[in-house]
A protein has these predicted regions:
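Short loop/turn segments immediately following beta-strands, especially the blade-tip
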Residues: 200-205, 250, 294-295, 332-340, ...
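Sec-dependent signal peptide cleavage junction
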Residues: 20-37
């Protein structure tokens, strides 16, 4: 080939090489292009079948049950059963990358750092569901709130996709939060701080700072309180000191509407009877005294009852129930023309199976029943059978000696207090709460850092 032909061939090849490069410059047809490689978005789906549900080694029965319910619900709905365990680790694993990479659903407070991070800033009734790497973090400001977070996560599983042997869930955007609407209000006689306080058990603690409402009393040994209604206003009754009782408005004013310093010695219970009479039972004095709720607290009618400790008005039967040392009895009370008349219903008088009766409270949800506690047992009394029952729902967990105060909520959950000797030999600092869940009664210890409680009341103005 001649030199001229070789030059022409080289120029032709160069032109063929330049043309596609020019096209890549984006000016050939006016359409913008990119030389970056085209990639798919990252796959944020995970297989729940490979995950382990983890709860704290020392978590409450309530949280443990929430973790178990999560596993069972996933199994029932999708036929996939995740593993479940507590958070126990060997010492060297607490900060290891191996544990951080484990696919886990963390329930409540665990020893994983992701749990602490997930709960940051939560109020006592608030909850959150978040993700951190391969971790799904379910957090609550209290055990009750954690249970609400588990339920919210179960709702999010509606978007899960069942595959062969797996359950795919997209973690993208899995960020849920809310506030638990569950409330368990209690009234507490805090003898250490000389106050009646109202707190919400759902928050998990009943320290002074947790009080929704409180009133300080000038005397010691507040022995009883309850919420009632008088002349269209919600009121708080209290028995306290050596010979005192009062009724104040349940609002910010805390207005004293009635008071006496003439109860029998060591008042232990008080009750507002709808006819306008306030009854106060005193243990050492061995009397129940009946006062005009609109009066000056200086005149009364008295009925003897040895070691009288508890009172409860029964609107259905129209009687005031009372417990003394070894007896449950009832009284008809009328108030006509300024005169109080009290008559014991001897036909309702019943011997209590054990000694030293202490508390008497409504069994909300069943008007035939009442709680009765003694120095050695917790009973449910059936009015129709005239029997003290020990086989009531939850008895296996609730039954014990020396219960100073007890009550239940309309959903069946039960709260009680026993002495721990921290302040006085007869007071306790923490409450035992049993959350009703079907046939189960799931234990939660409700803590206080600064209380000394004698009685606890389900905060309900209804008599039964």
């Amino acid at each position: 080939m001649s030199l001229k032909k070789r030059i022409i061939a080289a120029l032709t090849a160069l032109a063929l090489l330049i043309l596609p490069l020019a096209a890549c410059g984006g000016k050939g047809n006016g359409t913008a292009t990119s030389d970056a490689p085209v990639t798919d978005l990252p796959d944020t789906r995970i297989d729940l079948a490979s995950y382990t549900i983890v709860r704290g080694e020392r978590s409450s029965a309530y949280v443990t049950n929430a973790a178990r319910n999560l596993r069972n619900e996933i199994k029932d709905r999708f036929g996939v059963e995740p593993a479940i365990s507590d958070d126990w680790l060997t010492e060297g694993d607490y900060t290891s990358e191996r544990v951080a990479a484990l696919p886990e659903i963390l329930i409540g407070s665990t020893n994983r750092p992701e749990s602490e991070k997930g709960a940051e800033g939560l109020g006592k009734n608030e909850w959150r569901v978040s993700t951190a790497g391969k971790k799904i973090v379910i957090s609550g400001g209290s055990d009750i709130a954690t249970g609400a977070a588990v339920n919210a996560f179960l709702g999010a599983l509606s978007g899960a996709e069942k595959t062969d042997g797996g359950l795919m869930l997209d973690l993208a955007g899995l960020a849920l939060s809310g506030t638990s609407e569950t409330r368990y209000l209690v009234g507490l006689t805090d003898q250490k701080n000389s106050t009646v306080r109202v707190c919400d058990l759902a928050g998990g603690s009943v320290s002074v700072a947790d009080s929704i409402w409180s009133r300080k009393y000038e005397y010691y040994n507040i022995a009883d309180t309850r919420l009632r209604e008088y002349n269209g206003r919600e009121v708080v009754l209290a028995a306290y000191g050596g010979n005192s009782a009062s009724m104040v408005s349940f609002d910010d004013k805390k207005e004293e509407l009635w008071r006496t310093d003439l109860t029998a010695s060591n008042p232990h219970a008080c009750e507002l009877i709808p006819c306008g009479v306030i009854a106060v039972a005193a243990s050492t004095g061995g009397e129940i005294r009946f006062f005009d709720a609109a009066g000056n607290g200086k005149t009364y009618v008295a009925e003897k009852l040895e070691d009288s400790h508890g009172l409860l008005w029964d609107p259905a039967a129209g009687v005031l129930w009372a417990v003394g040392r070894t007896v449950l009895t009832a009284y008809e009370v009328t108030f006509d023309g300024g005169k109080i008349t009290v008559t014991e219903r001897r036909d309702l008088r019943t011997a209590i199976p054990s000694d030293w009766a202490h508390d008497l409270q409504p069994y909300y949800g069943n008007t035939d029943r009442m709680w009765v506690t003694t120095g050695s047992a917790v009973y449910v009394y059936s009015k129709s059978q005239k029997k003290f029952l020990t086989d009531y729902p939850g008895a296996a967990k609730i039954q014990r000696k020396n219960v100073k105060g007890i009550g239940n909520f309309e959903d069946g959950s039960v709260v009680l207090i026993t002495p721990d000797g921290g302040f006085k030999t007869w007071t306790g600092r923490d409450l035992d709460f049993y959350a009703a869940d079907g046939g189960s009664y799931l234990y939660i210890s409700v803590k206080s850092t600064d209380g000394g409680f004698y009685k606890v009341r389900a905060w309900n103005k209804n008599y039964q």
